[in-house]
Amino acid sequence: MTEDPVYDACAAFVNELASQGVGHAVISPGSRSTPLTLTFAETQDIKTWVRLDERSAAFFALGLAKSSGSPVVLLCTSGSAAANYLPAVSEANWSETPLIILTANRPPELRGWGAGQTIDQTNIYGSNIRWFAEVPVITEPNSNWFQRTAARAVHSSTGLRPGPVHLDWPFREPLEPKLG
């Protein structure tokens, strides 16, 4: 545990993904996804792959999931980056391939006001996903909730009808970890 509830929540989530058997995360980095990106980079139990082009990243993750038979995490920053994942998400839906899509987002108070890299990411993938959740803005530690949410993401993506799930993570600034 650190003194930073955002990074503690991300660590609880990522560690639970690893304990549930997730072995790969494909990251299309951006500033808004910094907390999750750094957390994945620090874990030894999930191999991280960085792909700058979101569409290529999504199809790379799809290939990893198809070849391994296990869910693969796909992480991007806010805005149109999430939209670039749609073709691969659709393919994952129809091929029943487990993907766990994590999209970073602006907090609710910055949406609808013209803030940069802000689009409506709520259910952006429509009927292509098995489960959607908007993660609450993290203001205090709640490791149990993040562990349960990670477990649900894995189970929802690997259930009777495997396929993609989507969690939208709103982050407030500062996005870097607290020092000290």
Predicted regions and their residues:
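N-terminal alpha/beta PP-like core and its mobile active-site loop of ThDP/TPP-dependent enzymes
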Residues: 1-180
